[in-house]
Regions:
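N-terminal [4Fe-4S]-dependent radical SAM core
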Residues: 1-7, 22, 48-50
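Residue-level signal for beta-strand positions within conserved beta-sheet cores that form or flank
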Residues: 2, 18-20, 82-84
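Alpha/beta-hydrolase
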Residues: 8-10, 115
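Local cysteine-cluster metal-coordination motifs and their immediate loop/turn environment
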Residues: 11-24
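Conserved non-cysteine loop/helix-boundary elements of the Radical SAM core domain that shape
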Residues: 24-130
Length: 130
């Protein structure tokens, strides 16, 4: 059997970093709700559920609110049953205890924490907040 992976792009950010070249837009609840609806429609077309990895990147996937994160985890559940690595990018500023619980319950077993620097003056220079 072929090794397969799934990348899910969540393009929403609470702020736009000057150095980032990835496809992103400012977080908007209505837009992100619609995006998740369309993502669910696309996922329903995937026949292959034997995935080795799932990677949720962005943008800032952790910019989604609790309800949206729960919906995302629910949508991906059928694809995550045999996954070895289930990763999501997060920004320290947009994470909290409840979001971590949602991700753990959803099966996430690896976080990619977007810490660019711990030095405040450098954060300011690159328009980064956390």
């Amino acid at each position: 059997m072929e090794t397969r992976s799934l990348y899910v792009h969540i393009p929403f950010c609470e702020s736009i970093c000057s150095y980032c070249d990835f496809c992103k837009v400012y977080y908007d609840q209505k837009q992100s709700d619609l995006y998740l609806q369309r993502l669910n429609e696309e996922l329903s077309q995937i026949k292959q559920h034997h995935l080795k990895t799932i990677y949720i990147g962005g943008g800032t996937p952790s910019a989604l609110n609790d309800e949206q994160l729960e919906k995302l985890m629910s949508m991906l559940k059928p694809y995550s049953l045999e996954v070895e690595e289930y990763c999501m990018e997060v920004n320290p500023e947009s994470m909290d205890y409840y979001k971590l619980k949602i991700l753990k319950k959803g099966g996430i077993n690896r976080l990619s924490i977007g810490v660019q620097t711990f030095q405040d003056h450098l954060l300011k220079e690159i328009d980064r907040h956390h």
